[in-house]
Structures are given as C-alpha cells and as structure tokens.
UniProtKB/Swiss-Prot annotation:
SUPFAM superfamilies noted in UniProt: AraD/HMP-PK domain-like (SSF53639)
Residues with the Phosphothreonine modification: 55, 533, 611, 675
Basic and acidic residues compositional bias, start-end: 566-586, 621-631
Biased composition (Polar residues): 665-674
UniProt similarity note: Belongs to the aldolase class II family. Adducin subfamily.
Purpose of the protein: Membrane-cytoskeleton-associated protein that promotes the assembly of the spectrin-actin network. Binds to the erythrocyte membrane receptor SLC2A1/GLUT1 and may therefore provide a link between the spectrin cytoskeleton to the plasma membrane. Binds to calmodulin. Calmodulin binds preferentially to the beta subunit.
Protein name (database record): Beta-adducin
UniProt-listed SMART domains: Aldolase_II
Description of its domains: Each subunit is comprised of three regions: a NH2-terminal protease-resistant globular head region, a short connecting subdomain, and a protease-sensitive tail region.
Entry comment on modification after translation: The N-terminus is blocked.
Self-association state and partner proteins as the record states: Heterodimer of an alpha and a beta subunit. Found in a complex with ADD2, DMTN and SLC2A1. Interacts with SLC2A1.
Pfam families the record matches: Aldolase_II
Length: 726
C-alpha cells in the first residue's frame, strides 16, 4: 500500500487549463493502475488524509488553548457530563504530547506529565492558596530532576500549608521527581499522619519526614524545606572546615549551621539538640556526612538558597581537587566582600525603574517557571512580574475627565436611504466619542448671526482639545506635591506663617476683598456715564418726553488752547462789567432792541441759531462750524454789534411756542457727528456768555435760586415776555 502511495504523492500537478479527461493518456500505466484500484483502497486513502488534518489540528497550540477555555467554562457552570470528561482527556493528551517551544534546548523531552493536573472539581476541597502551593512544590521537584540533583531516596521538598493546623505537603514514597504532580502530593500533619490523600496510591515516608517535622517545630517562621544529598553537598558536609568562602555563591548562602545527623529524629534529645544548633535565624543546615537542608520563608527563597549552595559546593570541590589543599586557596573576607542582595535580588528595580519590593529569589524562580511552561510542563504558576511590559498610557488621557458619556439612540424603524450616509457618519462620531472622551472640550463661541443682531449670548459647542485656543490658565496640572506651586528659594517658615494666617482668618470668618493684584494696581476702571444734561434740564411737567439714551454733553473747554482760554477769561470779565452797567439802564428802556443786544451773551449761541433758522439741516459741514467760531471771536472784539435784522430775542414777533422749541432741540441732539461738533462749539460760546467766578471758572449767578432742576433758558425767556407785556 505504501509503494502505491509514493507515485501518487510524487506525481506532478496537472495543468489548470486542460480538461480532466485530457490530462491522462489511455496508454499511461499510472492511469491504468489508478483506474483499476479497488474502491476500498480509495476510501482508505481518503481516511488517511482526514486523519492527517485531524492530527495537525490536535497539535495546534491555539486549538488546545481554546479547548481548555471551553472546559473551564463548562466546569464553572456545573456541567460534569461525559462529554466534558472526554474533552478533558483530549486536552491532557495534547499537553503530554505537544512539542517543546525551544527544540534546541538540551533539556528537551519528548514525553512529560503536566504539573498542574488539578481540575475545577478537584480545587473545591483545597484550602486558600493551596492550589498554587501544590503547583510550586511540584515545579521544584521537576527542577531538581532537570538539574540532576534528585536521588532515589530521601530527596524531599515539603511546604507548610497552614500555621494554625500545621498541615504540610510532601510527595509520596516511591514516586520519582519527574512524576510528581500537583494532585499527587499528600497533605499530612506534624506527626506525619495523612490528612488528605493525593491521586496516587503510594504511602508517606514517615522516616524521611521526621527531620522536616523537627525543623518545622523548632522554627515556626519556616514555610519551605528542601533536602539534598548530592555528591558535591555530601563531600562538603564531610569536610572538617565545612563550606569555605572561596566563591561569590558561598557568600550568598549566608549563615550556616552544622549538625551531626544519625539518620533518625525519634528521640526528644535529638530534637532539642537540633533546635539549639539551628538557632532563630539560620537558613542553611549542614548534616555531617549526609547532605544539606535549605530553609526559607517562601518556596522561592528556599530554592534560591539551595541553588547557590549547590553551586558553592561544586566550586569548592573542584578548587580543592585542583589546588591540593586549603592552604593554597584564597579565602574571601565576609566584611570586605559582602553580596548585594538588597540591590540585585530583594528589591526589583532599585537600579533601573521604580522601586517595587519583591521576595528573595522571586525573579529567578519566575524565570525557571517560564522555562518549564515553554517546555510544555504547564506549571500553573501565577506570575507577579509579566515578561512583556504593557504599554503605559499617557497621563493626558485621564487629566480631563469625560464630561458627557451619554448618546442618543437612533429611532426605530427602517432607515431612510437618503439619510443612510448621515447615520453612518453619526455612528462613527459616536464611536469615536465613546472611545476617546478626553479629546473634546466644551467651549463658548460667540455666534456670528447673534452677534450681528446685537445679542451677546454665546453659543456652546464641543471642539477638539487641539483646536481650542488655550487660555492663560493652561491645562490642568496634576498636584503630586502639596508644595508644588510654592515659589523656589522661599523660606518655609514664611509659607507656614502665611498658611496659618489664612486659616486663622477663615476661622474668624473675616470677609475681605482678598489680596490686591500687583498687575492690576495701576489700572483705573471706567466710571459709568452720568445721565445726559438735557434730561436734567427738563421740567417736571415734561417728564414723559425724557430720553434716557442721550449721551453726556462733552467738555466745551477740551479743544481750546491756552491762548484762547486767556482771551476767553478777558472777554468774560469785560462782559461782566458791561452786564452790571446794563442792569442799571434796563428799567428805563425795557423794550429797546438796541440796549437788549449786550444781554444776548447770556443766551446760548445755539438758541440764536434756532431762532434764526429753526429748520436747520443736521448735516452741517465743519466749515460752517469754523465760520461760527470766527464770527464769535469777531463778536468778542466788537461787543456793540447788533443782531441780524428780523430776529427779536424777547419781543412778541417770536411765534414759536416753548413746546416747539423743545421738540426741535431734542431732534437736533440726535444728529450726526458733524452736528455734534457744531453744537459743542456753540455750547462753548454759550458758556462764555455766563458769569465767571473770581478764579476764572464759570459760576452761577447769585440771583438764581438753588433748585433741584434748573429751568431751561427758553422757559425763562417766555416769563420775561409776560413781564414785558404786563
């Protein structure tokens, strides 16, 4: 059968474009043999191909992991059917026949029994943490076998499971180190009596456990004991000088104790002598002419001690055999050559990386566990330090928490084809928002439409953090130190005094404006504008016609030079003297228009313009304003000039009523900027016509009464007309 399969496997593939019946010639002997083959042979070949594919699947590590996950999931649900049991058998078979990850390793084995053979149902009756303890002890047995340190008898590794109940784990008698599994370990008490029998049928070696029980009774702090009697350790234990400090490994071992062991620990005197010899802190016990025992608080520490002790013994035996005696060896001094256990072993990352405390020998033991897992032993060890470092996320991802995490679901029903693209885009935005919520910030942006309408209300939007213009406050800073924002090179006592002072103010509930800013000390805030002068001049009867939107009258003297101010003072003094002379002549000739002309400066030039042309256009040019200033200056030089014809200030010819003058005055106040310049200059001239104080500043006339609201000039004018008529 095998001869027939060789040509079939070696035959070249037929061309793809040729028909099936044209591929073979009828005279071809291979074709004739295949055509005459029996149907059962063809079926056998097909089954062989199927089995080949099944074998490839079973040897796949991914399929094995998936199968183990399925078994664990079903066992958690409580499904203990025969199918699950069959799957478990398949998984165990695949684990025992799988190839090693590193086939070039010298310790490669073709067949191995998995260490962690505890299933979910078996782990229910175990104590807390006992499953991991069983896996560790079984792994140590496998390491002793791989390193060649295992002997046929009295090579035991024990572990204290519970301090309260004094239960211990030990391998059964007659089981080699390569056969020990987690389920085969036996749980015994301090007397060596079986508490829980393992999966094997072998008993406990009570004679070999006597030494371990005596050490556990003398040292309650010890959790693990490893007993070896390899040729190197037995040779060193037979030497009178014991272990010599000839290597670095001998220094790493630490303090040692020597005890004359006779092979039994049945007598009470032997236990007392062992306790005295061992002491409270010693971790290495050398049994004379027998071997060594390593003690440890953990399994990792015990294996760390026994590993370096075995290496030190091998170095010493080799050195003595080559040197010919102790006098030819160079011994290290313990005080000068101290090992760096704290920096290299006990503290992981003291030289590189963060300070993270670890147990003695933990990193070395985890490296060996990874080696066993790669070889397919399935140690079941729980790693504290992962082999591949995970990528650390940047702090910016958590500096700003997510403000909004909710989203709106789409409405039920068939999606509209026209909106399908929009829905997909919305879904992408929602997914991106949920995945990275910290890349968006809530920003108040002024809407252009609302700004054009005059509404200052901003518009709230969400923008990316990179697109937002950062303010002076910047990004939030994580406070890691309470004095992070204290200025450098400051006295700590001053900081404490200031802090106590602030706390005292908080206790007394003192309300203040807070510390004054040094940057804003020279800034002067703008005062709110006072109500317009025109609204103050309105009478109480005309309160309905007030206009609150009018602006304050500008200062009439702001645009004058020093020379003009001096001329203005002289003109005011001169007119004041003329007014005093006119008051005496006024009762004699009240109706004379020529004598009333000097009194015209009391009336504002703006009112003269209103009487002359009440319908003045609001858009006057600046040239007319300059002409008015020139005419006002000419009037100051020639005080006796008369007013134009047809204009009567206090006569009956004025037909305009007070209401009309008031409405026209208000309409002229709302004109453009050109009219404001003209009116400001006219008001400047009107102020010049008023009385002056001795210092030169305008002041009120002593004949006027102090009132809350000053009566407008055009109302006074109407009262004067009534007096003249009477």
């Amino acid at each position: 059968m095998s001869e027939e399969t060789v040509p079939e496997a070696a035959s070249p593939p037929p061309p793809q474009g040729q028909p099936y019946f044209d591929r073979f010639s009828e005279d071809d002997p291979e074709y004739m043999r295949l055509r005459n083959r029996a149907a059962d042979l063809r079926q056998d070949f097909n089954l062989m191909e199927q089995k080949k594919r099944v074998t490839m699947i079973l040897q796949s590590p991914s399929f094995r992991e998936e199968l183990e996950g399925l078994i664990q999931e079903q066992m958690k649900k409580g499904n203990n059917s025969s199918n699950i049991w069959a799957l478990r058998q398949i998984a165990d078979f695949m684990a025992s026949t799988s190839h090693a990850v590193f086939p070039t390793s010298s310790m490669n084995v073709s067949m191995m029994t998995p260490i962690n053979d505890l299933h979910t149902a078996d782990s229910l009756n175990l104590a807390k943490g006992e499953r991991l303890m069983r896996c560790k002890i079984s792994s140590v047995y496998r390491l002793l076998d791989l390193y060649g340190w295992a002997q046929l008898s009295d090579t035991y590794v024990t572990l204290r499971v519970s301090k309260e109940q004094d239960h211990f784990l030990i391998s059964p008698k007659g089981v080699s180190c390569s056969e020990v599994t987690a389920s085969s370990l036996i749980k015994v008490n301090i007397l060596g009596e079986v508490v829980e029998k393992g999966s094997s049928c072998f008993p406990v070696d009570t004679t070999g456990f006597c030494l371990h029980s005596a050490i556990y009774a003398a040292r309650p702090d010890v959790r693990c004991i490893i007993h070896l009697h390899t040729p190197a350790t037995a040779a060193v234990s037979a030497m009178k000088w014991g272990l010599l400090p000839v290597s670095h490994n001998a220094l790493l071992v630490g303090d040692m104790a020597y005890y004359d062991f006779n092979g039994e620990m049945e007598q009470e005197a032997d236990r007392i002598n062992l306790q005295k010899c061992l002491g409270p802190t010693c971790k290495i016990l050398v049994l004379r002419n027998h071997g060594v025992v390593a003690l440890g608080d953990t399994v990792e520490e015990a294996f760390y001690k026994i590993f370096h002790l075995q290496a030190a013994c091998e170095i010493q035996v080799s050195a003595l055999s080559s040197a010919g005696g102790v006098e030819n060896l160079i011994l290290l001094e313990q005080e000068k050559h101290r090992p760096h256990e704290v920096g290299s072993v006990q503290w992981a990352g003291s030289t590189f990386g963060p300070m993270q405390k670890s147990r003695l020998g933990e990193h070395e033991f985890e490296a060996l566990m990874r080696m066993l897992d790669n070889l397919g032993y399935r140690t079941g060890y729980t790693y504290r330090h992962p082999f591949v470092q995970e990528k650390t996320k940047h702090k910016s991802e958590v500096e700003i928490p997510a403000t909004v995490t909710a989203f709106v679901f789409e409405e039920d029903g068939a999606p509209v084809p026209a909106l399908r693209q929009h829905a997909q885009k919305q879904q992408k935005e929602k997914t991106r928002w949920l995945n990275t919520p910290n890349t968006y910030l809530r920003v108040n942006v002024a809407d252009e439409v609302q700004r054009s309408m005059g509404s200052p209300r901003p518009k709230t939007t969400w923008m990316k953090a990179d697109e937002v213009e950062k303010s002076s406050s910047g990004m939030p800073i994580r406070i890691e130190n309470p004095n992070q924002f204290v200025p450098l090179y400051t006295d700590p006592q001053e900081v404490l005094e200031m802090r106590n002072k602030i706390r005292e103010q908080n206790r007394q509930d003192v309300k203040s404006a807070g510390p004054q800013s040094q940057l804003l000390a020279s800034v002067i805030a703008e005062k709110s504008r006072s109500p317009s002068t025109e609204s103050q001049l309105m009478s109480k009867g005309d309160e309905d016609t007030k206009d609150d939107s009018e602006e304050t009258v500008p200062n009439p003297f702001s645009q004058l030079t020093d020379q003009e101010l001096e001329e203005y003072k002289k003109e005011v003094e001169r007119k004041k003297l003329e007014l005093d002379g006119e008051k005496e002549t006024a009762p004699e000739e009240p109706g004379s228009p020529a004598k009333s002309a000097p009194a015209s400066p009391v009336q504002s030039p703006a009112k003269e313009a209103e009487t002359k042309s009440p319908l003045v256009s609001p858009s006057k040019s600046l040239e007319e304003g300059t002409k008015k200033t020139e005419t006002s200056k000419a009037a100051t030089t020639e005080p006796e000039t008369t007013q134009p014809e047809g204009v009567v200030v206090n006569g009956r010819e004025e037909e305009q009523t007070a209401e009309e003058i008031l409405s026209k005055g208000l309409s002229q106040m709302t004109t453009s900027a050109d009219t404001d310049v003209d009116t400001s200059k006219d008001k400047t001239e009107s102020v010049t016509s008023g009385p002056m104080s001795p210092e030169g500043s305008p002041s009120k006339s002593p004949s006027k009464k102090k009132k809350k609201f000053r009566t407008p000039s055009f109302l006074k004018k109407s009262k004067k007309k009534e007096k003249v008529e009477s």
